Amino acid sequence: MIKIIYIYLLIIFFNCASQAPPQGGPRDIEGPILLGIQPNNKSNISMDNPIVLSFDEYIDPSSIVNSVYIYPSIDVSIRVRQNKIVIKPLNKWPVDSPVEINLSRNISDYRTNKI
């Protein structure tokens, strides 16, 4: 009889905490939000300084392809570093003309939420 009670208590004891993966948090349904640009808009910069776009979450590097447009058209290197897009001219930025950078809405985070 004591063995039965002992076995019953062991079964109850080991079944108290149900084993399951953690629930996680709420599902990410918001796209990345542009937080800032360095250097500031309409500022004079060195001819070879990069332009850095900062977002509130990590950017999927594969979403950048054909999503950043630069006018006038110049050769640039575009890299993604965590939550930043770094645009650096391969030669130099144009001397006496403004540079316009347009972002397409195809830029997304790792959950494919677009900006």
For each feature predicted by the language model, list its residue ranges.
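Acidic, low-complexity Ser/Thr/Gly/Pro-rich repeat segments typical of extracellular/periplasmic
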Residues: 16-115
